[in-house]
């Protein structure tokens, strides 16, 4: 008879995720995961041929957790502000998972920041289109522009170098969100990247 499987695959992934949350993805080794489970390394290799495969599953679980934060943000009265606030909350509460998803070079475990941006756009697109009356391509560009601001704050947070309060960051997000939305809707060709930059800036700075 084959030996009885003591741990299911999802239990091993959950243990590996706990290690990653506490110590980072590079600490997800067979020994550390086995220690988290309180067993030898044997059960891990019942399900996985390599640790890279397990790390890839940890990354997928990190995405699921991140998605929960984003969906909470989208349920608010001002979707993008809610998304931005939840993104920053994720960085504060799960700094190691944030590093895994957003601050690694693309490899077999994580697709890196640009893949995470696309994942985020896919989550937010429908709400932005519906509430802000944007076509899909404009919603994606709008999200990209605002995400770059939020990414900057989140990176300061996870590197423990953020001097701004939650209120200050929220105010910046509101200002930038309003400015970009207004500009995309009122400056012809801006969202498409085909506008007379000199003329637009000239008219703006010459206002009293």
Model-derived regions: residue spans:
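Hydrophobic alpha-helical connector segments
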Residues: 57, 70-97, 134, 146
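Basic, helix-initiating cap at the start of DNA-binding domains
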Residues: 1-23, 30-32, 36, 53-56
